[in-house]
A protein has these predicted regions:
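Conserved catalytic submotifs in the C-terminal HATPase_c
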Residues: 100-110
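Conserved HAMP-HisKA connector
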Residues: 1-19, 27
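Conserved polar catalytic motif of the HATPase_c/GHKL fold
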Residues: 124-129
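Short conserved segment of the HATPase_c
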Residues: 164-190
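Short beta-strand/loop element within the Bergerat-fold HATPase_c
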Residues: 137-151
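Conserved DHp (HisKA) dimerization/phosphotransfer helix of two-component histidine kinases, i.e.
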Residues: 25-29, 42-98
Length: 244
């Protein structure tokens, strides 16, 4: 199964590369024609064509992120430092958004086994969704706590907005406790989206990163706020010595 999975993603990567090459040619041609013949910019069809090309390119970029979310190169990661680096990375990725960040996190150095690049892509998806829900100006809360068992840590991202349009009161999928919910599976299905003109890969990326990290994922709405939480196994001392 793993071999077939790797082969599938390899073929997808090749096909995506070829499609992106063709799209780059189309966009370059569109830009050249627009420059040589500025009078055609007033034609509605021409403007719609440019929007369509950009829209398809955006979809391909999103599928690229989804494809790479399957990769996993584990290493010891200081989760506390990682969380506090998120606002700066978010501001670089989304300079037009003015969200404030509030932290309520465990100040101890907590280590997990993770691929920092893939984990960052998952959290950027959650932060971006939280920002969009509050018109890119509201406050985003990042919370972390070590669970009662002492072996796991949960990180949650909360933003204003609800999931009322898909009407889940609460849902979760957590391999750590062997739980599942059909609605979570539906939301995490590639290209399923409640937004217009949306690629529908955000939660798919998050769910896949959680799966490769043996982490749990939960999502719920209460009192006009939506919270997404990820639960990680804490790296034990013996594991730290054996992790590169």
């Amino acid at each position: 199964i793993n071999h077939l999975s790797e082969q599938c993603h390899s073929e997808l990567s090749f096909a995506s590369h070829e499609i992106n090459n063709q799209l780059s040619f189309i966009r370059s041609s569109y830009q050249l024609i627009s420059k040589k013949h500025p009078e055609i910019k007033d034609f509605p069809f021409w403007a719609e064509l440019g929007d369509a090309v950009n829209h398809i390119i955006s979809y391909m970029e999103r599928t690229g992120l989804y494809r790479y979310s399957f990769k996993y190169v584990p290493a010891k990661l200081n989760l506390t430092e990682f969380l506090y680096s998120l606002p700066d990375v978010f501001d670089e990725q989304f300079p037009n958004r003015a969200n404030a960040f509030q932290f309520d996190t465990d100040t101890r150095n907590i280590f997990i086994c993770a691929d920092s690049k893939r984990l960052l892509s998952a959290f950027l998806e959650l932060l971006s969704n939280a920002a969009e829900a509050d018109n890119s100006y509201g406050s985003i809360q990042i919370h972390s706590h070590v669970n009662a068992c002492g072996h796991t840590v949960t990180v949650s991202v909360t933003g204003k907005g609800s999931l009322s349009e898909i009407n889940p009161s609460e849902m979760q999928t957590n391999p750590l406790i062997d739980a599942d919910a059909p609605l979570t599976a539906q939301l995490s299905t590639p290209f399923f989206s409640t937004k217009e003109n949306h690629a529908g890969l955000g939660l798919s990326i998050v769910a896949q990163v959680c799966h490769t990290h043996h982490a749990g994922f939960e999502l719920y709405s209460r009192n006009g706020f939506t919270t997404a939480g990820i639960t990680f196994p804490i790296l034990a001392m013996d594991d730290m010595r054996n992790t590169i």
